[in-house]
From Swiss-Prot:
One term of GO molecular function: hydroxymethylbilane synthase activity
Pathway named in the protein's UniProt entry: Porphyrin-containing compound metabolism; protoporphyrin-IX biosynthesis; coproporphyrinogen-III from 5-aminolevulinate: step 2/4; Porphyrin-containing compound metabolism; chlorophyll biosynthesis
UniProt-listed NCBIfam families: hemC (TIGR00212)
Summary of the function given for this chain in its UniProt record: Tetrapolymerization of the monopyrrole PBG into the hydroxymethylbilane pre-uroporphyrinogen in several discrete steps.
Subunit structure: Monomer.
Protein name: Porphobilinogen deaminase
EC annotation from Swiss-Prot or TrEMBL: 2.5.1.61
HAMAP family: Porphobil_deam (MF_00260)
Naturally occurring in which organism (per UniProt): Prochlorococcus marinus (strain MIT 9313)
Amino acid sequence: MVLTQLRIASRRSQLAMVQTNWVQAELEQAHPGLSISVEAMATQGDKILDVALAKIGDKGLFTKELEAQMLVGRADIAVHSLKDLPTNLPEGLMLGCVTEREDPADALVVNQKNAEHQLDTLPEGAIVGTSSLRRLAQLRHHYPHLVFKDVRGNVITRLEKLDAGNYDCLILAAAGLTRLGFGDRIHQLIPSEISLHAVGQGALGIECVEGHPEVLEAIKALEHKPTAQRCLAERALLRELEGGCQVPIGVNSRIEANELLLTGMVASLDGKRLIRDQQRGPIDRCEAIGKELAETLKSQGAGEILAEIFAAVRPEA
């Protein structure tokens, strides 16, 4: 069966549309005869901006509405920031493609008042804006003298709040800033020794309906195998820990020769307990490496930390 048209479901946030438009352009270049349309929509995570993400709940916060469009036959694929895509997908859907990763690091963004500071020179009581429990826990561990405040909204809104003086600095994904044209606002890339990034951060995941080989073949033109292998390991670790996008689990992965080196971290919300370890193995065992590292972290107490966090941030009824 020859594929003649492709319907993409996307979040309608500015960053999501930049990413989806890139996917559309790349697919049109790879398949000149293919007619591609985009349907943009708001997800639950886009609509609820006055509650911390972890309190809303984690299952499909930024993906469920897009998946519903595919399941009822109104869309063929959905484009996600891979870090937002749950590791367990609805029956009938699959992760069909992972694109080449941008720099997955977290970035420090400062206002003019703090232009002379790096993360480790911020004064006591400086207000750091982040909506991520992962960043919060790691930064509390290393910088207990700083004050952390939740920040919601799209990237532009967050930058406006920063420049208005509501925060001294923000911690954001470097990849998102770069894709939106705000790479010049990156004041410092935070070393992985301080902040391990989110699972899948910096990569795009293209979700599709199972049983449609022509769609899968079309989107595979955008697949970047080394990124996919790294992200498979990261997602296997997250799945094995039964974590989600809104818990303090951080990772870093590297491919060295034919081996994959995966580092993983679980921390308590107050940052006082932080468990970190790594696993190395042949790259064709990427998912097994993720599972094995998860078991190692569990043996060191990660399960107990996560159980406490799930109880503390359980979504409000």
